[in-house]
Each structure stands twice: as structure tokens, then as C-alpha cells.
């Protein structure tokens, strides 16, 4: 049986070894064992999202444009990935290609569902309390010499954290259940893989929203 050694502690009773079969690192090591191109660095694993014993998604990319990262990991007639599935007692495996374009990566991560569009949501600006202006009089103003200068204050732009990144994914109505997955698993794993909060909408709902928006715009112009 294959296990991942997650931690080793030394105490007075001797070393304690903690092992896991649910850690994503175990899946990574199994791919390194079964896929020579991963072990030699030609193909790299960008991220893994896993619900151990049920399903996992693995994002891979290639440093060689002539090497297909997904096909390489799947292997001839699926032999490589099947060996990993067998080791993990039938855990389903989705291997998707990682690309720098986040929209395409999200679409890949939702495989096997078809994606029509990915709309990124702007993060809400942080709410800051306005400071009350202090009443100043001429007596409170002090003069400074021309030779002294105050450093200019620069406000840093707020950093968008992973938790704030979100998008709406539009899929054909017939693909909605497939995109979401059983008990939401496909969407959940895709969100963890891409580090985006994903809201999946059917195309018909988005069209209705657009029609309503156009009607409201026409009414306001009249």
C-alpha cells in the first residue's frame, strides 16, 4: 500500500511517523512514479484538488510545446492514469491543462462540461470610514521653512485575495447539471483547482437578465 509521510516527530519514545492516503501530495507522488515526463520536469503539476476516495482534478502543463501534458499523463490507452486510479481504489481522475489565461483555465477545470463564457466579477472596494474634518483656525497654522519637505503619502491599491476572486460561468442549459456535478462536486473541485469562486448559470437565465437590462435601459431613455 502506498502512503504519504506527512510528518515525523522525535520524542523520548522514539520517532513518530504520520502517514496519509488522503493528502494531495500522495497523488502528486503517484503521478511522478507513473509519468516519467513529470519526474524529469517536462510536464509539471500546477495544482491538485481532491476529495479522497471519490474524485480529483489535476492541472498540468508542459515546458515542451511538442509534449501534450494531458495525453502524457493519461498514457497509451489510459494506462498511466488507470494505474493511479487502481492504487487509489477507483478514485475518479480528471486531468486538465493549466493555461495562464484564467478564463480558459476555468473552462478546462469544469471539464467535461461545455463552457460558453466566463465573466469575472470585480471585487468590492473596501469600505472606509470618513474621518471628520478638524476645524482649523489661523492661530493653529504653523509655518515651515521652504527647505523642509514632507514625504508624499502614497495609497497602496487593495490586494485582491484568493477568497475575493470570483466569476460567473455560462453553460448551455443542457450542461448545467454536468457542470455543477453530483452534490456540486465538479464545480467545487474546479473552484479549488483554479482558486476562483465559481457561480454557474444556464445560458437562458443570462439571456433573460440581458433582455431585462435592455428593457430597463430603453425605458430610462424614453
What are these regions (language model features)?
Residues 1-222:
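RNA-contacting regions in translation and RNA-metabolism proteins
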Amino acid at each position: 500500500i502506498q502512503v504519504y509521510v506527512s510528518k515525523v516527530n522525535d520524542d523520548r519514545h522514539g520517532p513518530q511517523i504520520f502517514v496519509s492516503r488522503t493528502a494531495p501530495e500522495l497523488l502528486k507522488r503517484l503521478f511522478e512514479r507513473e509519468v516519467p515526463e513529470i519526474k524529469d520536469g517536462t510536464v509539471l503539476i500546477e495544482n491538485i484538488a481532491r476529495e479522497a476516495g471519490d474524485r480529483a482534478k489535476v492541472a498540468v502543463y508542459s515546458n515542451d510545446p511538442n509534449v501534450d501534458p494531458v495525453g502524457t499523463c493519461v498514457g497509451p490507452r489510459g494506462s498511466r492514469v488507470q494505474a493511479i486510479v487502481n492504487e487509489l481504489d477507483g478514485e475518479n481522475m480528471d486531468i486538465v491543462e493549466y493555461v495562464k489565461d484564467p478564463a480558459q483555465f476555468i473552462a478546462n477545470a469544469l471539464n467535461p462540461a461545455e463552457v460558453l463564457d466566463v465573466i469575472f466579477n470585480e471585487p468590492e472596494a473596501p469600505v472606509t470610514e470618513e474621518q471628520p474634518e478638524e476645524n482649523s483656525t489661523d492661530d493653529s497654522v504653523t509655518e515651515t521653512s521652504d527647505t523642509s519637505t514632507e514625504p508624499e503619502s502614497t495609497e497602496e491599491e487593495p490586494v485582491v485575495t484568493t477568497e475575493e476572486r470570483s466569476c460567473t460561468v455560462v453553460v448551455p442549459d443542457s450542461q448545467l447539471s454536468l457542470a455543477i456535478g453530483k452534490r456540486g462536486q465538479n464545480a467545487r473541485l474546479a473552484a479549488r483547482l483554479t482558486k476562483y469562486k465559481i457561480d454557474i448559470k444556464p445560458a437562458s437565465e443570462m439571456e433573460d437578465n440581458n433582455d431585462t437590462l435592455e428593457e430597463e435601459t430603453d425605458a430610462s431613455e424614453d
